[in-house]
Structure formats: structure tokens, C-alpha cells
Amino acid sequence: MRAKIISVVANNFYVHLYDLKIQIKAIPKGIFKHNSHELKPMVGDDVEVELIGNTYLITKIYERYNQLIRPKVANIDIVLIVVSIVQPDLNTLSLNKYLAFYEARNIKNVLIGLSKYDLANNHLKQKINKLILDYKKNNYAVFILTKENDILLLKEKIKSKTLCLAGNSGVGKSTLINKLDPSIQQRTQEISHFLNRGKHTTTSTKLISFANGFLVDTPGFGNLEVNLTKNEMANAFNDFANYARFCKFSNCLHIEEPECAIKKAVDEKLIVNRYDDYLKIIKELPNDVLKIKTRAQNRKCK
């Protein structure tokens, strides 16, 4: 039977059986414990489960199409990064870091959700509307979470998917969750625990049934650290992709290298909105590794 691992507690694995639509406890077959060359089961894995006697055994792990280390989860279909426009103010540098990180981790659908749009003044809304157009030009789907039509579109987008929700506390994640799947209110205790984990338990990951699929929550922006190399960052900005292949050097970082197609595109105004942020991010890299701590940043859109 095919199943998905939804939780790991100590050595106990809890899986969702797709056909029966039930959740049961399973034990990994010994090969996963004793063979260092075998994948180790993790939350999000699609697995094969066999009932032997009274025990469900995990006998096979299907190939992963992506995975994160923190939170430790595999096979994410969609990441929705929720950022507020005000209270707290929108931080575009942090947003761009996270977009780059998830792109680098082979997550194909990275969405942007803007909350508290209705609290912005007209001047700020004009700035935000221009920003939305810029991100859409770079093939990012942007949803204004206070607009009912955008919520309907988002519901359709995430249906039957494994959704990873990222965002700092106070940006409206719990409100959004209730909008996307009102039935979640029937599991109040579960979702409350899910969204309010202490700082020492942020590496513990759990999937819950959500919108005919699954939901995994990440720690807030200020708590989540991710490492990227300079080359990973250079390849993670999707608006660079059409130009980077024309750079003279295959490992071009698009900073001071000669015959850099990205710098040429910037000079010709073909890339206009994120290159400055890219340079700021690259300059932060100590010893070729970026540790993202977004609370250290203070760039706001006003």
C-alpha cells in the first residue's frame, strides 16, 4: 500500500494510507536502519507499506523530488511565503532571500502571499502594486490575501498538494489557514500546537490533512537559518536564468566578472528590480556560505 509519512516521534513513524484514507503507525524495515547506503525515512516521504502480522512495515521509499533539512521534510509541492505589507512592514530583501532559497532547493511552485493590504495607505498600495507586477514578470504568482478572489484562486492552486507555509509570526498565517480550509477549525487544538511551537522544537515537523492534501509549517523568518553557497545563490534568481547562460564563465557570480550577461542585462534595463538585492545578499556570504537570518535585515517598502 502506498502511503505518506506524516509524523516521526522517536522511532515511531505515522503514515497516511492513500487508498484507505486513514493514519496508522508503521515501522521502517531493518534495511533502512542498518544500511548506510539506503535513504532514511523522513516526513513527507511517499513510501510502500506492508501489513505483516499485526505490524505495518515501511518496505520502500519512493524517489524524492525535493527535500529540506530544516524543517526536515520531503516532497513539497508548493511553498507559500506569507509577508505582511504593514505591521510588520514588508521586507523585500528577506523575501528575495527566501525565494532564492526555495528555488535552489528544487521547489518548482513558490508563491507569494501579501497580507494586511487593506491596512496600507494609497501611497503604499501604489508601491506594492508596482512590486507585484515586477514579481509577476519574474513568473512568481502573487496573491493579495485580503481579496476574496485571490483566496479562491489560491484554494484551487493548493488543492490536493503538500503545502509548506513560511512566514514570521504576526503576518496572518493562522487567519489564512482558516480561510483556505475552514474545516481546520474542527481541529483547533492540533492547529494551535502546530503553529505555536517553542523555539527548541522547530526541527520537529508534522504534516496535517489540509485542503485535500497536506500542510507543513516552517519556523518564522527570524528563526529559520538556511545555508546557500555563492554559486547556488547565483543560480537561484529565476529572472537571471534567460541571460546567465550567455555569461563567459559557467560559474559567473555576476559581480565583477568580464563578459557577464547579467550585468549587461541590468545596464540595458532588462533586469531592473532584484539585482541590487542580489548584490547585497552575495556580499553577506562568509566563506562561500549564506546563513539567512532575516531579522537582521531592515529594508522596508514604504
From Swiss-Prot:
Q: Give the record's keywords alphabetically.
A: Cytoplasm, GTP-binding, Hydrolase, Metal-binding, Nucleotide-binding, Ribosome biogenesis, RNA-binding, rRNA-binding, Zinc
Q: Which cofactor does it need?
A: Zn(2+)
Q: Where is the CP-type G domain?
A: 65-224
Is-annotated flag, keyword Hydrolase?
yes
- Report the domain of life of the source organism: Bacteria
Compartments, record wording? Cytoplasm
Binding residues for Zn(2+)? 247, 252, 254, 260
Concerning InterPro entries, the annotation shows:
G_CP_dom (IPR030378), NA-bd_OB-fold (IPR012340), P-loop_NTPase (IPR027417), Ribosome_biogen_GTPase_RsgA (IPR004881), RsgA_GTPase_dom (IPR010914)
Indicate where this protein is primarily found. cytoplasm
Task: Mention one GO biological process in which this protein takes part, according to its record.
Answer: ribosomal small subunit biogenesis
Can you quote the record's cofactor note?
A: Binds 1 zinc ion per subunit.
Report the EC code(s) recorded for this entry. Answer: 3.6.1.-
Residues bound to GTP are 115-118, 167-175
Q: Give yes or no: UniProt keyword Cell cycle.
A: no
Q: Which GO terms describe its cellular component?
A: cytoplasm
Q: Under the GO molecular function aspect, what terms does this record hold?
A: GTP binding; GTPase activity; metal ion binding; rRNA binding
Pfam family membership, one? RsgA_GTPase
Q: Which SUPFAM superfamilies match?
A: P-loop containing nucleoside triphosphate hydrolases
Tell me which family the UniProt entry assigns to this protein.
Answer: Belongs to the TRAFAC class YlqF/YawG GTPase family. RsgA subfamily.
Q: Subunit arrangement? A: Monomer. Associates with 30S ribosomal subunit, binds 16S rRNA.
- HAMAP family from the UniProt entry: GTPase_RsgA
Q: Main role?
A: One of several proteins that assist in the late maturation steps of the functional core of the 30S ribosomal subunit. Helps release RbfA from mature subunits. May play a role in the assembly of ribosomal proteins into the subunit. Circularly permuted GTPase that catalyzes slow GTP hydrolysis, GTPase activity is stimulated by the 30S ribosomal subunit.
The protein in question is named Small ribosomal subunit biogenesis GTPase RsgA
Q: Which organism is it from?
A: Ureaplasma parvum serovar 3 (strain ATCC 700970)
